[in-house]
Swiss-Prot record:
Positions of the RCK N-terminal domain: 410-527
Protein name from the UniProt record: Putative K(+) efflux antiporter KefB
Lineage, highest ranks first: Bacteria, Pseudomonadati, Pseudomonadota, Gammaproteobacteria, Alkalimonas
Membrane topology category: Multi-pass membrane protein
Species of provenance: Alkalimonas amylolytica
GO cellular component terms given for this protein: plasma membrane
Amino acid sequence: MLLDGTLIQLLFLLGFMVFMVMLFQRAHIPASIAYLLVGVLLGAHTAGPVISEGYIHKIAEFGIVFLLFTIGLRFSWQQIYQLRHTILGLGTAQVGLTTLLVALLLWAMGVASVVAFVIGAVFAQSSTTIISKQLLEQGEDQSRHGRLGISLSVFQDITAVPFIIVIPVLGVAMAQDIASTLGMALFKAVLATALVVLVGRYLLRHLFHRVSSSDSAELFTLTVLLVCLAAAWLTQSLGLSMAFGAFLAGMVMGETEFKLQVEAAIRPFRDVLLGIFFVSIGMLLDPMLLPEIGHIALAGALLLLLIKIVLVTALVLATGVALETAFRTGLILAVGGEFGFALLALALEGGTLDSRSSQIILTSVLLSMMLAVFLIRYNLQLSRFVVGRWIGQAAVSSEPFDDIEQHGLQQHVVIAGFGRIGQGVAQFLQKEQVPYIGLDLDAARVKNARLADVPVFYADSTDPDTLIAVGLAKARLLVISHEDLSAALTTLRHARTLHPDLPVIVRTRDESHVAELRQAGATEVIPETIEAGMMLTSHVLLMLNVPARRVNQLVQEQRINRYQLLRQQFRGSADLLKTQQQEQLKAVLLAEGSPAIDQSLQMLDLAQYGIQLTELVRAHNRIEQPSLDMVLQENDVLVLFGSAEALEQASLVLTHRLAAD
């Protein structure tokens, strides 16, 4: 039953996606599997409600575009250059050998050579979408095996271009035409890369400096979308995939100080559209054929996983990489790829494959995707079990993984807010050779600091993705030096969610929000004005010849007591606009007729009003912390500490104004 109306279809699709994802998350099953199942249930091959596939597939393509853009942000040209031999050598060998092995195996089983070649090409692809999304979620995208897996899968996406050109002309016996077509595709890829890199490096940084200086989040997001889609359009106009252009644009942006904020801006679009992409893949499957072809498809999926795990492990191991890392890379790349679906569609359209064969291959690839999600998620446990059990514990690599630690993001300090205070902290950390990363949203400040090779990024610390990207899970300490209380609280709450045990020091302007910040999870709160007062007091005492040891002792006592003495202040008329809940000092004179005269402090029970008696002044003598049995006399002055509201109430009682009213 085809649902009528685009809006109705979209609402039904989104509602079903929300329901299935919630259901699968309760069972701790990846959301991508839920999306695939949604596609199967809402596709044209089932008896239930049917969503039109036309516009779904068009929308879904942008999911891959934004994903490749995000991947590009995390892969600088320097990283690609360092891995050039590994990527080109391993990538070519993996794609070529997988295609050849599968084709030879199927040909030996009686499958036509052309069909065997197509199936081999399909099986050679790996899903960059699943691999990168899963590794990003697990925080393994910058590990040694993660970078190898993503790099090789992106290379496979590039090799899909010649396959897309070759498959439609397999029936043509003119090798010269095929060679010229492939040569033209390579030329276009080089041209697109040159255009995006040259234009991007000279224009994008200046463009984003202007945009970020406007302090408009909407303008920043619009600019990110413009850059991503413009690069995608460029490569599409040259006959290449949109995803390839987005990847190039991402790599250019990844070399700027804006990359963390760019990734945060693109993420909502990426996640939603990727979900729709997986739905579109599920729509291709005909579940009615499963009883007939299920066993063949399952065998194909297992064959695909086995061949790729063994082959990739052997190839990576041959480059000198540790066995455990090689096996983990093999597990990651075992998954079938979405570009394989494009090859299937071309082969089906050109008559190379019949409908039944395409359904078998499609089902095999989908099954491999479902299984590979779990292989990727548990790649560490599986590699240590298999390598340690079958080959021996000595073969398991003991070297640290090439992840956050080897990028300077291990036991580091994250400074949220790189203004005057944040930079002061950074300078002392630099002197002590403590690694740190600064985050700030002042584009000019970030630009100047980066010119001096200071590790600061234009990024919003209130975005949890930013905190994840700077390795908060591996950090030693978080310093929040925002002047804006809202930004400080938001950053603090996200940090506590991501890393409950991380020590967090928060700077605040004064003592008025200390309690709120502590309640939100701050380990220490440093009121700027109070610390300045303590420093001034220290100099005063030293100039009065008070021993330095005694001065340090007094300062430390105040810090241990959470600045209790310095928080006890008398408020003036300029403080009337302060919140009534802010604690302060107030002196109350017990004049003639006060009901407090001739009563002991214990009988008076000032604590019931939520206030504290700090001292009593009698005949110009100051008595600090008087005993509870002391009896009050006329003309005594009580120095009280508490909120303005509580002090006012106590003052009315002590001066008998309530009785007078």
